[in-house]
């Protein structure tokens, strides 16, 4: 028998639930098409399902007809994007995760205090672009670092006037190392009162650390562009456990299961539970084909998540203040 352990918690977080519900509610109330800037969450299954219902995903606002309804993704947007939306007279539902908005508020406060700000995050990630875009380049100074090596190379104007924030979906351990490097190099740097890495990211990484003590293979259900899903793979590999990420059950390779006795399954914060169930079905098929083995599925205990975020008002808003 092959033992399969399900990480707990796994899958959707409160911010993802909220973002998807905002799109579905807008479609129900106003009908298709509803435009969404960027994938509302980084999961192909979710995006394709919403497209079938009438959502249209765009990267550039030029693709959105003037006066149309637009939803900002859970990753947040820069002030420049908000200005462009206002100029095009777009009606906005903002699906930015409240925990990302918290970081935006921190950046605005630090900038108002005249701080130079260091952001710890991944170059090119939409959350990073949105957060970096909370201050005007002509007025404030913001730097991006990803590793301790980046910190060693960082050149700032005033070492005594620094603050830092982080992307919400980083590896907790990696972020801690970068923060320590910042504090070692810039002893007067200050950080947020509460960690920026979100509760769901922390909980899912902790659950994988529990899995790797019991399993010889970890499968992460998530899309390649999902930061938090990639970090779950990294957590397992950092513990010298074989780990793979799959966007759909068909990507699960038979060779991965060879000589494996215990397999751990988890899912990124943007991956729905239906994909986990499909992966389990695929595992059972492979196990039966390889050696007529059965599969014993167990759910591990874990942190109970009760966080919920309220939806925005049912009416879209205009960001005229950004014009």
UniProtKB/Swiss-Prot annotation:
It is an enzyme of class 1 (oxidoreductase). GO terms for molecular function: 4 iron, 4 sulfur cluster binding; 4-hydroxy-3-methylbut-2-enyl diphosphate reductase activity; metal ion binding. Transmembrane segments: none annotated. Keywords: 4Fe-4S, Iron, Iron-sulfur, Isoprene biosynthesis, Metal-binding, Oxidoreductase. GO terms for biological process: dimethylallyl diphosphate biosynthetic process; isopentenyl diphosphate biosynthetic process, methylerythritol 4-phosphate pathway; terpenoid biosynthetic process. (2E)-4-hydroxy-3-methylbut-2-enyl diphosphate binds at residues 42, 75, 125, 168, 226-228, 270. Its EC number is 1.17.7.4. [4Fe-4S] cluster binds at residues 13, 97, 198. It catalyses: isopentenyl diphosphate + 2 oxidized [2Fe-2S]-[ferredoxin] + H2O = (2E)-4-hydroxy-3-methylbut-2-enyl diphosphate + 2 reduced [2Fe-2S]-[ferredoxin] + 2 H(+); dimethylallyl diphosphate + 2 oxidized [2Fe-2S]-[ferredoxin] + H2O = (2E)-4-hydroxy-3-methylbut-2-enyl diphosphate + 2 reduced [2Fe-2S]-[ferredoxin] + 2 H(+). Isopentenyl diphosphate binds at residues 42, 75, 125, 226-228, 270. Disulfide bonds: none annotated. The active site is at 127 (proton donor). Its cofactor is [4Fe-4S] cluster. Pathway: Isoprenoid biosynthesis; dimethylallyl diphosphate biosynthesis; dimethylallyl diphosphate from (2E)-4-hydroxy-3-methylbutenyl diphosphate: step 1/1; Isoprenoid biosynthesis; isopentenyl diphosphate biosynthesis via DXP pathway; isopentenyl diphosphate from 1-deoxy-D-xylulose 5-phosphate: step 6/6. The keyword tRNA-binding does not apply. Dimethylallyl diphosphate binds at residues 42, 75, 125, 226-228, 270. The keyword Transmembrane helix does not apply. It comes from the Bacteria. Gene3D superfamilies: 3.40.50.11270, 4-hydroxy-3-methylbut-2-enyl diphosphate reductase, catalytic domain. Belongs to the IspH family. Catalyzes the conversion of 1-hydroxy-2-methyl-2-(E)-butenyl 4-diphosphate (HMBPP) into a mixture of isopentenyl diphosphate (IPP) and dimethylallyl diphosphate (DMAPP). Acts in the terminal step of the DOXP/MEP pathway for isoprenoid precursor biosynthesis. This is 4-hydroxy-3-methylbut-2-enyl diphosphate reductase. The lineage of its organism: Bacteria, Pseudomonadati, Pseudomonadota, Betaproteobacteria, Nitrosomonadales. The gene is ispH.
């Amino acid at each position: 028998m092959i033992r399969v352990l399900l990480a707990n918690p796994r899958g959707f977080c409160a911010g993802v639930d909220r973002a998807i519900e905002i799109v579905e509610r807008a479609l129900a109330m106003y009908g298709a098409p509803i435009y969404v800037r960027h994938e509302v969450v980084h999961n192909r299954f979710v995006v394709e399902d919403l497209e079938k219902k009438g959502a249209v995903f765009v990267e550039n606002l030029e693709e959105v007809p003037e006066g149309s309804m637009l939803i900002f993704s859970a990753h947040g947007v820069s002030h420049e994007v908000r200005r462009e939306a206002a100029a095009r007279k777009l009606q906005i539902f903002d699906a930015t995760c409240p925990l990302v908005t918290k970081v935006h508020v921190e950046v605005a406060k630090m900038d108002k205090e005249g701080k130079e700000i260091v952001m710890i995050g991944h170059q090119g990630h939409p959350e990073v672009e949105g957060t970096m875009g909370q201050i005007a380049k002509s007025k404030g100074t913001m730097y991006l670092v990803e590793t301790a090596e980046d910190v060693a190379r960082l050149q700032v104007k005033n070492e005594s006037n620094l603050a830092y924030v982080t992307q919400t979906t980083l590896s907790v351990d990696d972020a801690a190392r970068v923060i320590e490097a910042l504090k070692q190099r810039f002893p007067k740097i200050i950080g947020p009162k509460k960690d920026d890495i979100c509760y769901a990211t922390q909980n899912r990484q902790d659950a994988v650390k529990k899995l790797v003590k019991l399993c010889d293979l970890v499968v992460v259900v998530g899309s390649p562009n999902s930061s938090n899903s990639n970090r779950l793979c990294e957590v397992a590999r950092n513990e010298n456990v074989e780990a793979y990420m799959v966007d759909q059950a068909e990507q699960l390779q038979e060779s991965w299961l060879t000589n494996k006795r215990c397999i751990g399954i988890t899912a990124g914060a943007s991956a729905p539970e239906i994909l986990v169930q499909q992966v389990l079905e695929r595992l059972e098929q492979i196990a039966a084909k390889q050696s007529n083995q059965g599969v014993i599925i167990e759910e591990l205990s874990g942190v109970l998540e009760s966080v919920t975020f309220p939806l925005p008002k049912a009416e879209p808003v205009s960001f005229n203040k950004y014009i």
